[in-house]
């Protein structure tokens, strides 16, 4: 009985017991829930498991006075880092222990899919697979491999010939007595009706399938029009400025402090290896992730962003274009650090649980006759072994913790993804012709963006600043001027928005993916067909969406015990804060305009889910594009004018 008491008083065993208690929620992937839950859609999913965030666990200790044995009443627990707080309660009934030890049997339900023997992994939330980007798969590749010129006329002529042949055949049957007689003689079968085109007795059935055409030629014409328009604008600007491009403000912005920006960016990248050092210390046994490792990492992540914001603004005093580039890149590196650190942090917890469960089984299996206690430890070993072994299936040398290395982190930072895992789908070779194509697309798109900014946007921005600095003549007058500026800048912003999307999510990410042989090119969905802001939030930026889904939405549910609505609010709130910080970096002031419009997406999502809007997809898409066309322009002019 003393051994049993020792085991039951062990904090590690208490933790395992609580993780699998009936009231502790399912021990499973933090993102098993359907992605639609993040945006208020009607879905049903399992409760997420916990990420590594400090959580307090209350353990009620029931001391049984009748025989001196100690039983522990389960409290609540998480999979994260835990701080044990004990409360002794004197009880007089040994049945207390027996009742609560039954909760160990819930382990199987918590770690197995219902009705099957399959484990529920912490990382079941998303998968990576070989797939091209939408533009490559739907437009570029078909255009290169299947374009054969005009096909509609050929198809029409083919069908006309088929129809003429059918009519001749019918005419021949009608004029031939033998053919007509044979029609009614079908070996006793029911008579067959012969359709004719010459009489109204029967109707000729003609295939009415809609004939589709290939619009690849218009794809070429579109880019041709863009190219000629850009060349014309370039020539006009050249002659209007005395045969020189030196006066281009946008060109000056793009070429100022390039060496300084590159140096800061390199320093920022190298400083991300701090999290690798923390993982090495955990690997060597210097630190424990569950007590100090996650704290050091979290503090460093916060200081990382604040420091580089302060450095670029107050010390280096860089131009706003340089500052926003470095700020956005710092966010990318921050998300990569967080995913790498907390992925391995979770596995440290699993590894420690496995070691404890194995040692406890070896020590107590023959001395404790309670099958539920032994079963809990056996199931713990089974699940933890599965979780550790399933992270690296093709390369056994990279199994945790062997994956913790500077090389592993380096390749992760090179891959166009924000979610860390040990293995990714990889292509066999680099297509250098494809890389060249994307490099040309990158510089060509930047060139178009510079022309658009210089001709359509910069003059309006200067007028907006002049309005802001002018004498105040009343709110109505200022609003009228703001509306005029808004109308003038909308066309330029629409072009800039589309070019910016193409530059980052197609040209740059696909180029990086090809250079690193990263197989999954699903960086965006067909967001242009969205009928609600819920769809848009999910598919316009897949890498960030996946990060928010795993490390914010589900983690907030696990760590802070939020429900789905509260976790959705938490996710949108954090996203809105980051967007507002970006506006602060650009405009040097906090106005919370973008924060407000970001949070406004939540009631808009609810509106699109109403019965009136649910089946009106065309109206939904029109409203969506109205927001896309007007939103960025409204934001820019508000920050510039007020």
Curated annotation (Swiss-Prot):
Gene Ontology molecular functions: ergosterol O-acyltransferase activity
Keyword list, A-Z: Acyltransferase, Endoplasmic reticulum, Membrane, Phosphoprotein, Transferase, Transmembrane, Transmembrane helix
Alphabetical list of InterPro entries matching this protein: MBOAT_fam (IPR004299), Oat_ACAT_DAG_ARE (IPR014371)
Reaction equation(s) it catalyzes: ergosterol + an acyl-CoA = ergosteryl ester + CoA; zymosterol + an acyl-CoA = zymosterol ester + CoA
GO terms for cellular component: endoplasmic reticulum; endoplasmic reticulum membrane
Catalytic-site annotation from UniProt: 579
Main location: endoplasmic reticulum
Compartments (UniProt record): Endoplasmic reticulum membrane
Region Disordered, annotated ranges: 174-194
BP GO annotations: ergosterol metabolic process
Transmembrane spans: 215-235, 292-312, 404-424, 442-462, 485-505, 567-587, 622-642
Enzyme class: transferase
Residue window of motif FYXDWWN motif: 523-529
Positions of post-translational Phosphoserine modification: 175-176
Disulfides per UniProt: none
EC number: 2.3.1.-
Membrane topology type: Multi-pass membrane protein
The keyword Methyltransferase is annotated on this UniProt entry: no
Protein task: Sterol O-acyltransferase that catalyzes the formation of stery esters.
Other notes: Present with 279 molecules/cell in log phase SD medium.
PANTHER family, alphabetized: STEROL O-ACYLTRANSFERASE, STEROL O-ACYLTRANSFERASE 1-RELATED
Entry's family note: Belongs to the membrane-bound acyltransferase family. Sterol o-acyltransferase subfamily.
UniProt name for this protein: Sterol O-acyltransferase 2
């Amino acid at each position: 009985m003393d051994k049993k008491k020792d085991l039951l008083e062990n904090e590690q065993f208490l933790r395992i017991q609580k993780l699998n208690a009936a009231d502790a929620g399912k021990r499973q992937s933090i993102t098993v829930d359907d992605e639609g839950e993040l945006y208020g859609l009607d879905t049903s999913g399992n409760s997420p498991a916990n990420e590594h965030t400090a959580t307090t666990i209350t353990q009620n200790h029931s001391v049984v006075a009748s025989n001196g044995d100690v039983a522990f009443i389960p409290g609540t627990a998480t999979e994260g880092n835990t701080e044990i707080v004990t409360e002794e309660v004197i009880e007089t009934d040994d049945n207390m222990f027996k009742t609560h030890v039954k909760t160990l049997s819930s382990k199987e339900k918590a770690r197995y899919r219902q009705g099957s023997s399959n484990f529920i992994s912490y990382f079941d939330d998303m998968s990576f697979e070989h797939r091209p980007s939408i533009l490559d798969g739907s437009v570029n590749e078909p255009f290169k491999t299947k374009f054969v010129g005009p096909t509609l006329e050929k198809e029409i002529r083919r069908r006309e010939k088929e129809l003429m042949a059918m009519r001749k055949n019918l005419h021949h049957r009608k004029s031939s007595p033998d053919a007509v007689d044979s029609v009614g003689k079908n070996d006793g079968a029911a008579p067959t009706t012969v359709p004719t085109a010459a009489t109204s007795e029967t109707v000729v059935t003609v295939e009415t399938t809609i004939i589709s055409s290939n619009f690849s030629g218009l794809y070429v014409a579109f880019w041709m029009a863009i190219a000629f328009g850009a060349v014309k604008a370039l020539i006009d600007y050249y002659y209007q400025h005395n045969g020189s491009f030196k006066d281009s403000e946008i060109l000056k912005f793009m070429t100022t402090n390039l060496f300084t920006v590159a140096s800061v960016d390199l320093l920022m990248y190298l400083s991300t290896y701090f999290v690798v050092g923390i993982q090495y210390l955990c690997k060597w046994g210097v630190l424990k992730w569950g007590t100090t490792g996650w704290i050091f990492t979290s503090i460093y992540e916060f200081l990382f962003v604040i420091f580089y914001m302060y450095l670029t603004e107050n010390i280096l005093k860089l131009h706003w274009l340089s500052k926003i580039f470095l700020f956005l890149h710092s966010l990318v590196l921050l998300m990569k650090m967080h995913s790498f650190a907390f992925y391995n942090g979770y596995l440290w917890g699993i590894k420690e649980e496995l070691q404890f469960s194995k040692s406890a089984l070896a020590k107590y299996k023959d001395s404790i006759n309670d099958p539920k206690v032994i079963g809990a430890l056996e199931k713990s070993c089974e699940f933890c072994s599965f979780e550790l072994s399933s992270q690296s299936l093709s390369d056994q040398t990279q199994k945790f913790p062997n994956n913790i290395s500077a090389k592993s982190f380096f390749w992760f930072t090179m891959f166009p993804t924000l979610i860390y895992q040990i293995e990714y789908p990889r292509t066999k070779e680099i297509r250098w012709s494809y890389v060249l194509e994307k490099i040309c697309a990158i510089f060509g798109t930047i060139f178009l963006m510079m022309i658009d900014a210089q001709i359509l946007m910069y003059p309006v921005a200067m007028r907006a600043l002049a309005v802001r600095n002018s004498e105040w003549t009343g709110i109505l007058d200022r609003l009228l001027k703001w509306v005029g500026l808004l109308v003038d800048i909308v066309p330029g912003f629409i072009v800039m928005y589309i070019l910016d999307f193409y530059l980052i999510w197609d040209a740059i990410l696909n180029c990086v993916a090809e250079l690193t042989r990263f197989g999954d090119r699903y960086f965006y969905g067909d967001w242009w067909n969205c009928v609600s802001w819920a769809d848009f939030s999910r598919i316009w930026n897949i890498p960030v969406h996946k990060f928010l889904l795993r490390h914010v939405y589900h983690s907030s549910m696990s760590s802070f015990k939020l429900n789905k609505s509260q976790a959705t609010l938490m996710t949108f709130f954090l996203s809105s804060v980051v967007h507002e910080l970006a506006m602060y970096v650009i405009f040097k002031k906090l106005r919370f305009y973008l924060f407000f419009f970001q949070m406004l997406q939540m009631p808009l999502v609810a509106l699109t889910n109403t019965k009136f809007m649910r089946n009106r997809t065309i109206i939904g898409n029109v409203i969506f594009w109205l927001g896309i066309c007007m939103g960025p322009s409204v934001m820019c002019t508000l920050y510039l004018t007020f």
